[in-house]
Structures are given as C-alpha cells and as structure tokens.
Amino acid sequence: EFRINVIALLFAFFLVVYGISFFSILEKMRYITYFRNLSTYLTAFMLLVITWNVIDRWWQIEKLLKAIVIVMLIASIVGVLGFSFEIFRVQFKSLTGYFMPSAIAKTGYGSVIAVRNIGFYNWFMGLGTYFRVSSFFLYSTMFSSTLAITLPIALFLRNINKGVKRNFYTFSVVIMGLSLLFTTGRVAIMAIFVGYVLFRFVSLRSFALKFSIVGVFLLLCSFFLLWLEQSGIFYQIIDLVLYSRGEGSANTRGKIYVQTFNSFLERPLFGWGTERDVKGLAYPLGSHSYYLGTLYKQGIVGFTLFITIVVLIWNKLKVKVFVDNNFTRFFKYGQFLMLVYIMNSFTDVLDLDATTMFFLWVIGGYSPLLALKR
C-alpha cells in the first residue's frame, strides 16, 4: 500500500516551483549550481517517500540514526586530525573535477567542487591564522551545520543506551563537539547552546514556571544590558561578534543581504532560480542565509512552501506524551534539533552540499515523522 503525507505533497509543490524558477536563470555558469541544488532536493523528496512507505519499526529508525552518527564521527575525527596535524591536511582532485569544464572549475564555487580538501587557512580573532576544517564537506559552514543538527541525535542515542554503547556515544559527542569548535562556525555553535536552553524551556510543563522564568530572565537581561551599555562593554561585545573574522566578513554579509533583498523585489513571485554573481561583491546574491536565499531563488511562493514544511515538522514534534520510552524521548530531542536548525538557517545556506541536505532531511524531518506513524 502506497502512502503519502501532507509534508511530501508540499515538498512536491516546492519542487514544481523550483522547476519554474529555472527559467529565470541569466548566467549560463549558474546552471550547474541550479542542477546540483535541485539534485539535493530531489534526493530528499525520494528519501521522504521511500522511507515513509518502507520504514515502520523503531529498530529501523534507530539503525538509520546510528549510521548517521558514525559517519559524522568519522568526519569529525578527520577534522580534528586535520586541525591538529599538518600531515592530514590532504588535497585531491574530485571525480567531478575530471569532467568539469575548465572555465567552471576556475570559478570560486567550481574550484571547491573540482579540488577537494579537508579545510583551508583562515583568520580569526585571538587565533590569528589557523586551519579551519571542513572535513568531507564543501565548506566549513556546511560541516558545522551538519554537526550542529547531528549532535542532538548523538545525545539522544547516548541517553537511551547504557554501558559500552553509552560510552561510545559519549566519545562521539566529545569528538563532534571539538570538531564543531574547530570549524569556528559561530552561528552553528551559538545555535547549539541557545537551542539547548530553549529545548529545556519548552520541555517544562508548568505554564506558571515558564512565565516566572521569562519574567526573571527579562528583568535580569534588562539590568545586565543597561550595565553593559553604561560601561561601554556592550559595543565591544558587538564588535567582537561581528568582526571576529575581520571587518570584511561583517561588511560583506551586510551588503549581500541588502542587495539580495533589493534584487528579489525585481522577481518576487518565483525568484531568480539560483544565486547570482554581481560586481563589487565577493559572494553571490542569495548566499549566507537559507531563508533569504530561498526567498531570492524560489520567490514568495517557494519560500511560503518551505516555511510551511518547517512549521508542520515542528508541530508534529509537539505532542503530549504520558509515558517515557524511546519514542517520547526522541520527540524531545527532535525539538532540540529543529530549534538548532531554525536558528542556524538565518546565516547559513544549507542546500549547497548534498551530504548536509541528506542528513538534514533524514534526521530533521523524516525520523520524527516515521516515529509518529506508530
């Protein structure tokens, strides 16, 4: 018996909009970007339909989650070794690189695909020049985003296991956490900490307790922010956050966001199909934000479908439970994961890397839905 759900239907409509946006592409070089991104969404859609109809037992879900954690543990070990020892900072030509036209391979995005490495040298305040790890992923931000959405699953598996298995997942969490720090992915790291705090808050059942916590928190924050502003430390903290990777990082992002939105207004319905290179910007329009990027590339129609899918997945996880078992614990950690994903998407584009998209939709969307089938 073939089964389908409302999220799969909305995903199908999103793919239709994605197809329509193809006709808005102006740069021929961007066709490869478009089809690469489209392939990640097609893969995600097929996985959604297949897993919804095939996987219907808890052990199958757990096996899938374990496989993802093991893969990310291996990627994290590679990242930690690459950060620590120069001998592991290998570089090689990818299989795609042998078939890619030289004109495309010489571009910024094409060169990353054609020649693979486990990281690159960068600058960060307090560290100076350092090796920023990306492991098997295209960019360090993709690696940090995938680590951020996988860590809640590793914590969940640690929670439901005992003995040697529990120690293994403890080790996995530590190594993945170290690797996340070595990516210096500021937003991904912040998303983990803030997401955990919000996760613990939404887990509280007492409305009075929640209201009291919010009231005390707002009061303390008001006094603390006032003190920071009066002492001048507040502006120093802002400068530290914004310019920790240099002034160019913050200034470039600001220009990208403004010009991306202005360009979106020219084709608001179905968008531009893909990112676009413009003179004067180091990075293309539609980059550095999953939300703004989706709005730019697929317009209001695609963005509305995308946000609706995220909201539906979140609502599926907000279920009242009266027993403590693997399913109910998974719902809770699923909320943690979604909070991390929602916050991380503000400044990172997650559909550039096929591996990131695969893990994102499997553990962020499919597994909670599969668990709810039973």
Question: PLM features: residue spans?
Answer:
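A membrane-periplasm/extracellular boundary helix in multi-pass inner-membrane enzymes
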Residues: I77-R89, F124, T183, S203-S244, ...
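Aromatic-anchored transmembrane helix interface
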Residues: L9, F13, R30-N53, A67-M72
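Long extracytoplasmic/lumenal interhelical loops at the membrane interface
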Residues: F131, L228-Q298, L317-F322
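Transmembrane alpha-helices of multi-pass inner-membrane enzymes
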Residues: V197, Y333-N344, V349-R374
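Alpha-helical transmembrane segments of multi-pass inner-membrane proteins
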Residues: L15, G19, M46-L47, E62-S94, ...
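Transmembrane signal-anchor hairpin modules in multi-pass inner-membrane enzymes, especially those
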Residues: E1-I20, L26, I32, W59-E62, ...
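Membrane-embedded alpha-helical segments of multi-pass membrane proteins
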Residues: E1, F35-L47, F143-L151, I189-V197, ...
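N-terminal signal-anchor transmembrane segment
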Residues: E1, V16-E27, Y341-M343, T355-V362
